[in-house]
Amino acid sequence: MKITTMSVVASGVVLGILSIGVTLPSKADVEELASIDNAAIAKNRETGNDWPAHGFDDAGTRFSPLEQINDSNVNGLNLEWSYSLASTRGVEATPIVVDGVMYVTAPWSVVHAIDAHTGEKLWVYDPKVPRSYAEKGCCDVVNRGVAVYEGKVFVGSFDGRLIALNAQSGEQVWEVDTLIDHSRPYTITGAPRVFNGKVIIGNGGAEYGVRGYITAYDADTGEEAWRWFTVPGDPSEPFENEAMAMAAETWDPSGRYWEAGGGGTVWHSMVFDPELNLMYVGTGNGSPWAHRLRSPGGGDNLFLASIVALNPDTGEYVWHYQQTPGDNWDYTSAQDIILADIMYEGEKRKVLLHAPKNGFFFVIDRETGDFLSAENFVPVNWATGYDQDGRPIETHEARSEDTPFDAIPGPFGGHNWHAMSYSKDTGLAYFPAQHVPVSLQQAGSWSYEEVDFGQPMSGTGWNVGMYINPIPPSEQPFGRLLAWDPIAQEEIWRYEHTSPWNGGTLVTAGNLVFQGTADARFMAFNATTGEKLWEAPLGTGAIAAPVTYEADGRQFVSIAVGWGGVYGLFQRGSERSIPGTVYTFSLDGEAQFPEFTKHQLDALVSGVDYNPEDIEAGTALYVSHCAFCHGVPGINRGGNIPNLGYSNAAIIEHLEQFVLGGPLIERGMPDFTGRLTEREINQIKAFILGTADAIRPASND
């Protein structure tokens, strides 16, 4: 493992910052930054002055005790300041606020330090991720934020590095390569966590054929402390530990699962209970998605789609609970985990609360891993419920190997990574629920890294073993905000949004729930009743979660916005647009909103000659190389990547000039040289143009 260590202060950097008139943190501020550790994060739960951890606290509650802004005065909230992130891709970051400084990440893992009082830029750090790396990620070049600990800011870069920065100056302190195999397309989009002096980071990539793991590094030096794999490797080699030997018993080696990695990546949720000295991680989907292709003899395939408890000091396995045994639908368990103490059947229990992709809300004993209850929070058709042992009661058709299954929820999940919050005052969890219709059919044949024209994005490395939407889904999409009672396992109230892919939530002691929406609004609700109390325009869809903090006796509410993520690549929720932006609101704010622009959607493309006989071949090529970013020509409106059905005719006529040679690599578009021929590009053109002609309204002439 190579660690690159940098000097803590570079005079040139400091002079450069001073030359643009920015005030650096004072000595007292630096001491405050240096004191941020898990004990300080726990203490902040009482005051709420800062937002020092990804989920506000190490339990991930996203509940602030601040109540200066409350259900009786929130309608007076106004913009205090805005800050441009100068980005055009998805913004998924939860800002961290410590002693008057906000740290927030933009696409491509760029870190911004902002004066939390005024919105002035303090410093910016760009890890210089190669833009060609974009095609190695399933779900946009996003980053969900940083960790701050003892004077350092930690960020995971999209290309797999963990980087420590000086919190005062933004200068790099150390950098470590976290990837075990550079021939595999691992990415990092999640925020690091720091528990007991160790920086914990996972990764993503299960759609492409990787083996999941998390790694802990010494926060001071960057030295590796431990690594824990989530799925077993080649059984002909010694297993790393007893947990991997146990897990291997649940996989069929005849499928040679290790060649495709197996999946199980820890790409998002990690929380920590200092009293039990346990950390909890949520693991991802299988690689490939299709259960019978990766493990022909069946089996639960541990530790896919599971909650796993580990010792944060050693990485030793303690317990697990698998929510979706033998995952077959991309039902990751990487969504937000919240630790809470509740009365359950007349007894005070330490539990964890979880609403993963599979559509069920779980309550699990966090001391033992025992299953307590599960109830669906959205319609589901893959299972009718869970038995008393905590296993799903599956429907027969959900695992059909020869007919399409209209999965409800689909792979976008009944709830995805968008933040969930929990109020100790109301006893309710608040989270964005959704459904994006998708039908799935197992591929007839499959092998790792084989390009299967018609299998989604296999031409760019996808490895799912499924055809997506071989028949049109029967369901309609929806998005809603839910308030859920985890004890009664029932919905208390809901607010229906105009589309899926809405932002995460914040709940406060002021009896308020805040949420940004796909249709570019920032909203506040009465946490008890669900009544909408306030909203403000954002200029672009919001997918990240808001935070709140106090400075100079005033409470602020902030949200970082920027439409994107996997759904936002090809679909949009708002006709307004603005670069990535941080907005901060207060009760006496007087700032003006930045100017919003309106999407300009051209007419369906026409005027380019094509051979109709090429449409069938072009359809399969488009699905395997283009569809997940550009959507269906003329059907999806385009997200932060344009829909080709509405392109200028000259672009489609000369499509090979954009597809070959890599002229758009700096925007994240792959170079398809050697992967597509000019003949195949002409077939893709035929599909785009033929689809546009097929859906074009008839002329009145």
Feature map (PLM): residue ranges:
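Repeat-blade elements of multi-bladed beta-propeller folds
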Residues: W51-G55, G90-V110, E135-R161, P185-R211, ...
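C-terminal capping alpha-helices of c-type cytochrome domains
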Residues: G156, E653, T673-D701
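Blade-level signature of beta-propeller repeat domains, shared across WD40, Kelch, NHL, RCC1
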Residues: V547-H599
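The canonical Cys-X-X-Cys-His
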Residues: G618-P633, L655, V659, M669, ...
